[in-house]
Amino acid sequence: MNSTMQDSPLSITELFRHGTNVFPDSEIITFEGEQARHTSFAKVAERVNRLAGALRTLGIVPGDRVATLCWNHQEHIEAYFAIPCMGAVLHTLNLRLPPSQLAQIINHAQDRVVIVDDSLAPLLASVIDQCASVEKVIVVGSGAVSGLGETLAYETVIAAEPPTFEWPPIDERSAASMCYTTGTTGDPKGVAYSHRSVYLHSFAVWGTFRLDDTGRLLIIVPMFHVNAWGTPYAGWMVGSDLLLPGRFLQPQGLCDFIQQERPTFTGGVPTILTALLNHVQTTGGDVSSIKTAVCGGSAVPATLIAAYRDVLGIELWQAWGMTETSPIATIAFPPKGTAPEDEMIYRSKTGRVVPGVELRIVDDAGVAVPHDGEAVGEIEVRGPWVTASYYNIEAPEKFHDGWLRTGDVGNIDARGYVQITDRSKDVIKSGGEWISSVELETLLVGHPAVADAAVVGVHDDRWAERPLALVVLKPGASATPDELREFLAPKVARWWLPERWTFVDELPKTSVGKLDKKLIRSDYGQAKYSVVELEATKR
């Protein structure tokens, strides 16, 4: 028996139309250093139409890739809608990649046009001669640029087009946007999101983050990474004011923007949110308008969640996902009826799977194991916004029986709460036992003198691998390896306790704020660290 329901396309065009028609007075607000620029959804929608017309005039047709190399601002939002709604593919370029990788992904995606901020033009100029597919460069901003040949001014090209555009029919399974993984363990790999996946993911973000038209959403998450976690699309769809910090991502700039525009919700990686917390504690900045923040990208220390609650009065939610999952897959809400004193048990977990996504854990043989909170294995995921392959790259080892292999190791309990204990490549295998680098890092950051920490496995003649702990101390604080190991001792098994310690000014991070453990291992192998070695503990 067939249903009687209508079959409407699930496309970004429909999200765009809805936000434009229902919430014309909601605003895009871009911080410009001292003051913010306010533009209504209705006015932005006209500019979206003009941009689509300009790209069509330049010869862009459905399926063509149009890249952006931009900060978070109104013009980037315009590209977020104009490019996919006209049938082309939005390719957001990671502005923190080294030039060699930037050129590699532009060439791999075969971008025909690049929209670039004037402040980022030197980065593009450093690779443009290597990018044969790029035919036109459109520059946002009025700053002088050089090294890019003949360029087009963003405002000039959109001013030449009418404020209306006839959007073509869209196949909901066609590519809408693409993002490349950060490539910490190999070359970056492209993930192409469909209109259908973005549409469905937007509803998941709306429900999971509880967005609506009474709220103001501060998008700190870079728009070059995984569609800024889908927040621009979800926020536009439900009429949330969208607050964009531009290039002003240092704590002082963020605080100034927050104090001026009073957002109610935000999100970011632990590095950014920790820096914001420290700034407020030392300068007294006012972030009281924010009621909720979501944190992801790497494990969120329980101490950070508690500090946001106790110091800032902000409820901090931990979320988990990856480029391949669009990215939202889990969110760490306590179950209904949890006593306040027990909430941290759940808030500090990786989270419970969001509706629409399935998770399982498998052993080394690929066999699913019980969700009992004890059995450990690799986490696999599937769902309508989870990738089934990579763009023009064969990677069969990443896919298993219709599931995406995440490379994360952990367990799932009977209530569906996930606890990631490590990346499969980062698990420390010592004398036949597994040691979780993530758990050691989280515990170390709980020490009052520690600002940041990383743990990696290094060669050991007796045990094959042992943990090396890298520690960043807070300004003015002091701690010794013995003190830190004593702090860990009651919290973990004895064989987990590191013998090798080094203190550093900062930890290497990837372009999206994750620990770069590949670089840490390389630097250790080249003896770049001054390592203190303690006497081994007895097993």
Enumerate the language-model features and the residues they cover.
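AMP-binding/adenylate-forming catalytic core of the ANL superfamily
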Residues: 97, 114-118, 266, 383, ...
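Gly/Ser/Thr-rich phosphate-binding loop
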Residues: 237, 263-268, 277-345, 358, ...
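Conserved AMP-binding/adenylation subdomain of ANL enzymes
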Residues: 199-216, 224-264, 279
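Conserved pre-ATP/AMP-binding loop-to-beta segment of ANL
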Residues: 9, 24-26, 150, 159-180, ...
